[in-house]
Amino acid sequence: MKRTFQPSVLKRNRNHGFRARMATKNGRQVLARRRAKGRARLTVSSK
């Protein structure tokens, strides 16, 4: 049986990366919430 999680950095960044977040109003709200919470990393693409 094939496992469901088949990692790909490209797909990960396209869906959850910084530019993907900035592209929509709701994505920007996500970033704002994470900034307010004090997250060290805002998105998966940020080191």
Swiss-Prot record:
GO terms for cellular component: ribonucleoprotein complex; ribosome. Transmembrane segments: none annotated. Residues 28-47 are annotated as: Disordered. It holds the Pfam family Ribosomal_L34. Gene3D superfamilies: 1.10.287.3980. Keywords: Ribonucleoprotein, Ribosomal protein. Residues 31-40 have a biased composition (Basic residues). One of its GO terms (molecular function) is structural constituent of ribosome. InterPro entries: Ribosomal_bL34 (IPR000271), Ribosomal_bL34_CS (IPR020939). The keyword Ribosomal protein applies. Disulfide bonds: none annotated. It comes from the Bacteria. One of its GO terms (biological process) is translation. PROSITE patterns: RIBOSOMAL_L34. The keyword rRNA processing does not apply. Belongs to the bacterial ribosomal protein bL34 family. This is Large ribosomal subunit protein bL34. It comes from Proteus mirabilis (strain HI4320).
